[in-house]
Amino acid sequence: RVVESSEEPETVNMRRAEWRTNKCKFTIMVSVATDREDKDPVNAAKKLLDEAEAKGVDELRREKDEWYRNFWSNSFVKLGDDYLENIYYLHRYLMSAGSRGEFPLAFNGGLWRWNRDVLNWGTPHHWNQQQEYWGLCAQNDWRLMKPYLDTYFKMIPFAEKLAKEYGAEHDALLITEAHNFNGVQWGKDKRYLRNNFTPASQIASLFWDYYEFTGDEEFLKERAY
């Protein structure tokens, strides 16, 4: 949407739209919605734009700047080497940009990748996605862990069922190497994945990290344990 414009974009085809104006400077707002969030994603996307336009660009920028000001104040490193320090801050930025919604960081590269927007797959998620979350709690970015941890909480019904298939009848979870966003154990029937269960203990350590750095006993008692 072009802010404060009386002209309407013209749809050329399903992949292209055009908007013509004599203005030299203008503001474009973009929203994204899918039928997972709303059965009518077009109207849902328009509603997001209406809310954003009503709030105004200046207020949106102020909110964004305030969020990042608080975020950057959470931690810092001083290593005496600009290159290494910048890697630390770059990773923090990548995680803040991609791990604040309902889902964890996009698998196999995250939100921003070196090869533009080329992504070989977005799901299933494999266990080695955990490496993106190593150290988040230690650097005081534990809030960014929530989408990752919630993904595994969604797996509980599927993991319980799989454990029973392997003979564990009560209070057992069996998590495979790969899974879908909704918790389905995608790797359980894959010949090259079905017997790889060691990732479960490594993933569990991230739940302990979250408790250890936050001291959230309710999380430990009611959810993780």
List PLM regions with ranges.
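Acidic/polar, glycine-enriched structural segments that form the non-catalytic walls/loops
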Residues: R1-G122, W142-M145, Y152-K161
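Helix-terminus loop motifs that line ligand-binding clefts
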Residues: M95, S99-W127, W134-S205, Y211-T214, ...
